[in-house]
Structure formats: structure tokens, C-alpha cells
Amino acid sequence: MSKLRVRFAPSPTGYLHIGGARTALFNFLLARKEQGTFVLRIEDTDVARSTQESVDAILQAMDWLGMSCDEGPIYQSDRFDLYRAKIDQLVEQGKAYRCYCTAEELEKKREAAMQDGRKPKYDGTCRQLQEVCDDKPYVIRFKAPQEGATTFHDRIKGDITFQNEELDDLIIQRTDGTPTYNFVVVVDDAEMGINLVLRGDDHINNTPRQIMLYKALGYPVPDFAHVPMILGADKSRLSKRHGATSVMAYKEMGYLPEALVNYLVRLGWSHGDQEIFTQDELTQLFSLDNIGKSASVFNPEKLIWLNSHYIKTGNPGRLAQLLAGHLAADGIDVANIADLEPIVVALQDRSKTLVDMAQQARCFFADDIQFDEKAAAKFLIEDNRFVFEALSAALESCDDWKEDILDGVFKGVLEATGLKFGKLAQPARVALVGGTTGPSICLIMQILGREKTLARLQGAMSRLGQ
């Protein structure tokens, strides 16, 4: 049995979207599991729409998700001579022909077919034409078999059959001389030795046409596996109106790559009831056998749940590095990344995304606290002056600024004043971070440090009654 060779072949006309990322992951994981080869091909034959910016964005997104190719990127735009040679081969063998029908003529044929209740398809006007008119624009069409059927075994969906009479003569070269998608993809997959084409099921209708081309060109036909689509919550095809569809948009929103990878692979594939997988587990367990045959629904809440898990269980040092980037985007430069680690530890259980964590971490760096208006109105009142004075006095005499020591000081203030915990902790929390939620009050004080803690308590007292 030959070694597995799979490919991911995006078009560089935009960013890598969720559906494309999942297709790439399925190919990547299968190649890694079977010690095969993962090829990256950039399908940039549409020169007008293809951009280097899009290529860079696709490569960046794949790198962020941890996907490295074994071969490539290979650019179709570098292979036009090969495509032209293969088209010439088909024409010389009588398997393709020039079609001089104009767009207006083709539209009339389409309308006539619709009026007669027939499926619109090219009627073969130029199929047997012997004359060659070099001064007239033309396309080149593949001479498709008109009888019989084309059947292939889809490794996800099973046997699929198309009646050849339903398929028309496919255009393989446009009037400007450029080859079309269905032609170049066959040539490339064959020339690159791709023996499994794993892609979205929106390509199923292309498959019989491509199989015909493989056979006409004398190439072996690869295996095919078509992955069901990803739908939005309303069961329509996933689009921007369902939320972000660009992979890198999720990075900007504070998602971890391992969370997105875990979620996307589980979107259509399963291994029992297991929800959370390490990269090694995905590589070991992934197979086509457990890919479902029906479409999957994108669930943002499930992705957030997974992201929360990976933040909660993540390495604080790594998360600190990532958090620094989000803080920098918010105008907060962290001189020493190590200073962020205790903040990360304090916020890991409370953060759904890194953006969420960055918003909560702002209070530890800001010179001016942004007070929650309701919290300030409730707790920064004259009746609580003695609370701040008692806590400030006790903290002034504390030299060992560690959480456990501060906890002892805090309990001492509770005992001395007779206050219940909330009556002391909530006013103090509002004074220190601007609101009533956050980590433990003593951990907040440890992270802020002695000078900043005392300054904020003093600042809160100056606001009392305002």
C-alpha cells in the first residue's frame, strides 16, 4: 500500500476561515497519524483576486494552529506551462475541443432548456466542429462521456453515482487562455501524487467531472472523502452573520489555538463521549471512520467553554506571554513578563478568553481606577470611613507583603472592628480594583504591592461621600 499523501489547497482571495481550517486540520492529523505527507498548495490561478496578503494570512493562521506542511507551499501560478501542455494533449487526442459559442448564445440555450423543463447544460454545438477559427475567441471544453454512469466510493458518505448524461462538457480553458479550477486541481493532485482527496462536501458535484479528467489524462484516480458542511445556529451555511469566521479573528478575541483546534476537530468527528483532547491524542485517535455524514452546527458557547478550560489548565508562564500582547493592544506595556504570572494565576479560573483576562488585569496597572458607578455609590460612603482607616492602619505596620500574611492582617481587622467579612472585603475590593468581583482580596493586595495598595485605599477615602 502506498504512503498516504494528502493536501490542503486554499485560494488566496481572503483569510483562512473556519471551514477551511477544519479541512486543513483533518488532512494534517490524518497525515501525522499514518506517517504520511501533508502538502500545502496555493490555488492562485485567479490572478485578479489572489493576493500575497491573503497567502501570508493563510500561512500565519496555519502556523498559529500548529499545522506545518511537509511539502509546499506550491503555487499553481508557477505551473501554467504544465497545465497548457496537458490541455494541448487532450485536444490532440480528440478528448477536448474549441468552443466558439458566445455568452449570449449560451444564455439563449440555457433559457430554452429551462422553458422546455430540461436541466441547463451545454448542448454540444461545437463538439464535432472541424473548422478552426483563430480570429474568434474560444474556450476549450472537455469532451465528457455522454453515456453510462460515473460511480465513486466516498470514504465518508459511501458509494455515490452520477449519470453521465447529466454532466455537460466542462470548460477547461477560458477565453483568456487560463485553465479552470476543475482541470488544474486534477493535474496537480495527480502530479503531486495525492492519493486521498479530503475536502468539503460542496465539492461532491465536481468529483465525477474530475474523475473523467483523471481517466482522460491517464492518471490513477485517488480516493475521495467529503466532509459535511459547518452550519450556523439557524442551520444555514456558516457565514459572517453567525460571528467571526476568520481563524485569526479568534486569536484577536483571545482564544487559545489548542481550544480552537480541539473544537474544530470535534466539529464533525468524535471519539466516544470525549470532549477534550491533547494534540497527541488527536493525532493518535483521528480517523475518517468517526466523521459524521451530516452537517455540524457551530456553537460559540461550546468554543468558549473549551477555551475557558484551556485557560484554567494552561501554563501561567505561557499565558503571561500571551496576555502581555493583549494588554499591549490595550495600551498597557508590561516591562517584566514574570510580573504577570501571579495575575494570570489569580484570573485563570475567572477568564473565558485572554481579552477577558486582559480587561480584568487592567486594574493592576492603571494609575486611575475606573470605578463601577453602582459599586462606588454603595461602598465608597462616609459610613465606611472607619473601615478604610482600620484596614490602612493595620497594613501600614505590615512589612511581609505575602498573601498568607496579609490574610492574617485582614482577619485581625475583622476581629478588632467586629465587622463581618463582606462588610470589610467589599469596600476594600471596590477601593482597590474598582468593582465587587475579582480574586481574593488578599491576593489582590499582594499583586498590587504595598505602595499601590495603601495609595488606593487613601484615594478611596478621598472619594467618600462624593
UniProtKB/Swiss-Prot annotation:
Chain ranges for the short sequence motif 'HIGH' region as given in the UniProt record: 10-20
Record flagged with keyword Zinc-finger: no
Disulfide cross-links: none
Cited Pfam families: Anticodon_2, tRNA-synt_1c
Reaction catalyzed: tRNA(Glu) + L-glutamate + ATP = L-glutamyl-tRNA(Glu) + AMP + diphosphate
One CC-aspect GO term: cytosol
InterPro entries per record: aa-tRNA-synth_I_cd-bd, aa-tRNA-synth_I_codon-bd_sub2, aa-tRNA-synth_I_CS, aa_tRNA-synth_I_cd-bd_sf, Glu-tRNA-ligase_bac/mito, Glu/Gln-tRNA-synth, Glu/Gln-tRNA-synth_Ib_cat-dom, GluQ/Sye
Compartments, as annotated in UniProt: Cytoplasm
Chief site of localization: cytoplasm
Tree of life domain: Bacteria
Any one Gene Ontology molecular-function term assigned to this protein's record: ATP binding
Free-text function comment from the UniProt entry: Catalyzes the attachment of glutamate to tRNA(Glu) in a two-step reaction: glutamate is first activated by ATP to form Glu-AMP and then transferred to the acceptor end of tRNA(Glu).
Protein name as catalogued: Glutamate--tRNA ligase
Organism, as annotated: Syntrophotalea carbinolica (strain DSM 2380 / NBRC 103641 / GraBd1) (Pelobacter carbinolicus)
Annotated gene: gltX
